Regions:
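Helical scaffold of the NTase/Pol beta-like nucleotidyltransferase catalytic core
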Residues: 1-38
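Short, charge-rich amphipathic segments
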Residues: 1-11, 65, 137-145, 149
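Active-site nucleotide-donor binding segment shared across nucleotidyl transfer reactions
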Residues: 24-67
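Generic structural hydrophobic/aromatic packing signal, biased to beta-strands
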Residues: 28, 35-37, 73, 99, ...
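Short, charged/polar surface micro-motifs in flexible loops or helix N-caps
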Residues: 60-64, 106-107, 118-121
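Short amphipathic alpha-helices in soluble, non-transmembrane regions
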Residues: 66-75
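Conserved catalytic core of two-metal-ion nucleotidyltransferases
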Residues: 77-117
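Catalytic cores of NTP-dependent nucleotidyl/adenyl transfer enzymes across multiple folds
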Residues: 111-195
């Protein structure tokens, strides 16, 4: 079972290399934004799902400036697709960027960069969740989360927060327990959940 730990370490190391190679942070900083790593890479809980998640903050949302940062990122040869969604006039008050990156080994990585207006409803939420997870995570719970992510069939779609809530709040330690926990909590919103 040591293999899943090595896989997690290698994927997390590679994810951070990709951030540097593509100059994600620098591209957003060039427009005066603050880019914050969130999600499984920020908590050390990345396993098989190769996702790089960032929240990007500015005082105001400018489509033109957001496109300027995105164009710089898209110019990296590893970026093979980039999509944009304008959610400025919604409760989220954001501009979403979703990119696909092919690494040197041919593996596809998903990059989600959510450009958020400072002071909006979701300002800092993902960062608070990551901070709380980091504060309560033990070696045993970290190992349980990584093992569950590893054991999850690739055909099954489970968001990270489900694993974290199941293990950290629900005491789940095996895949059968995760399946039962998910069934018992089907329809529950994890928006606002903190350990």
């Amino acid at each position: 079972m040591e293999d899943y730990r090595k896989m997690a370490e290698a994927n997390q190391r590679r994810g951070r290399e990709i951030i540097a190679e593509t100059q994600l942070v620098e591209s957003w900083e060039a427009i005066g934004a603050q880019a914050t790593l969130i999600g499984s890479l920020s908590t050390g809980l990345m396993m098989k799902k190769l996702d790089i998640d960032m929240h990007v903050y500015t005082d105001t949302l400018s489509i033109k400036e957001s496109f300027r940062a995105a164009a710089r990122i898209a110019s990296h040869p590893g970026i093979v697709r980039m999509e944009y969604t304008n959610l400025i006039d919604t409760e989220e008050e954001c501009i979403e960027w979703h990119a696909a990156y092919r690494d040197r080994d041919g593996r596809m990585w998903k990059m989600d960069m959510i450009h958020i207006r400072r002071g909006s409803a979701y300002d800092g939420f993902a960062e608070r969740m990551a901070s709380r997870i980091g504060a309560v995570l033990t070696e045993e719970t970290r190992d349980a989360i990584l093992r569950l992510k590893y054991e999850t069939p690739d055909t099954e779609s489970i968001i990270g927060a489900e694993y974290y809530a199941a293990v950290l709040s629900g005491g789940v330690r095996d895949y059968a327990g995760l399946t039962a926990w998910r069934e018992a909590h089907r329809g529950d919103s994890l928006i606002g959940w903190l350990p």
